[in-house]
Amino acid sequence: MSGTNPGEADGGAADAVLIAGPTASGKSALALSLAERTGGIVINTDSMQVYRDLRIITARPTPDEEARVPHRLYGHVDADVNCSAGMWVADAAAALEEALAQNRLPIFAGGSGLYFKALTRGLSAVPPIPSQVRDDVRARLERDGAEALHAVLARRDPAAAQRLKPRDRARIARALEVVEATGRSLTDWHRDGLPPLLPPDKVRAIFLAPDREALYARIDARFGAMLAAGALEEVRALAERHLDPLLPAMKAHGVPALMRHLRGEISLEEAAEIGRADTRHYAKRQFTWFRHQLPEFRWTSPEEAEAQLSCVIPGPR
């Protein structure tokens, strides 16, 4: 696999390991294995696995797996919270400080590119906006109009709303995208950004890149396994809370389709196929995003990943 990593440092030990990759590529299992071998702490770097209500449908580590080594930032946020990248960075900073204070290797594992980017580059003054947030805001713009979104912006970012005319469609949408994606106003981002948590030359960063067809087959099989493990009941409990459908937890892959099934709109088989297709499309986007946004990550097959990490971290710390 191609790719370079500024943190390789002639085989020296890294201050932290970053394990990224598309959904269902084996990141959690690799992180668990590495943590057991090194006495490390696994730190969640996935925007959906932070939610307490969604263990099954987001493929969080099982309670047994979490008991084997310390896990942080898994299921620590309620579904009624919009956990922004800025909130995650603050939580990740505390988890990183804990790991280093205990002389444990911090192992960041997940699939959220913006979170990994924040670790080694910080959050920029004008952060990249996830396509899901952007598409949602643009759909609301078409449905409700610029003046309605301007009223929403006045509550979320009053300073930006005051600067913008109520019919300035593009700038209103941009300001609202930023505050909804990050939890910080565009005004704040223009003033300052968040610094990186880790020096890029002191980390070992890999991207698990399985064979595409094998990955898609695994995604399809895993969705069926989730249903067998109780994913529908998990989503039913979430639906009974009657939360805002625009909250991130309500849009996790598989959740909207299963909620449609619970409302009697589609069959369970149709919901499962929609969930599988959405997850496959997400995996494709993850490949593309990491290739262009974080080229310093070393791409490797899951089979080669253990050896890649063993070269840098030969034994317990």
UniProtKB/Swiss-Prot annotation:
InterPro entries: Dimethylallyltransferase, IPT, P-loop_NTPase. Pfam families: IPPT (PF01715). Its EC number is 2.5.1.75. One of its GO terms (biological process) is tRNA modification. Keywords: ATP-binding, Magnesium, Nucleotide-binding, Transferase, tRNA processing. Substrate binds at T23, A24, S25, G26, K27, S28. The record marks S112, R134 as: Interaction with substrate tRNA. Residues 46-49 are annotated as: Interaction with substrate tRNA. It is an enzyme of class 2 (transferase). It comes from the Bacteria. It catalyses: adenosine(37) in tRNA + dimethylallyl diphosphate = N(6)-dimethylallyladenosine(37) in tRNA + diphosphate. The keyword Calcium does not apply. ATP binds at G21, P22, T23, A24, S25, G26, K27, S28. Its cofactor is Mg(2+). One of its GO terms (molecular function) is tRNA dimethylallyltransferase activity. Belongs to the IPP transferase family. Monomer. Catalyzes the transfer of a dimethylallyl group onto the adenine at position 37 in tRNAs that read codons beginning with uridine, leading to the formation of N6-(dimethylallyl)adenosine (i(6)A). This is tRNA dimethylallyltransferase. It comes from Nitrobacter hamburgensis (strain DSM 10229 / NCIMB 13809 / X14). The gene is miaA.
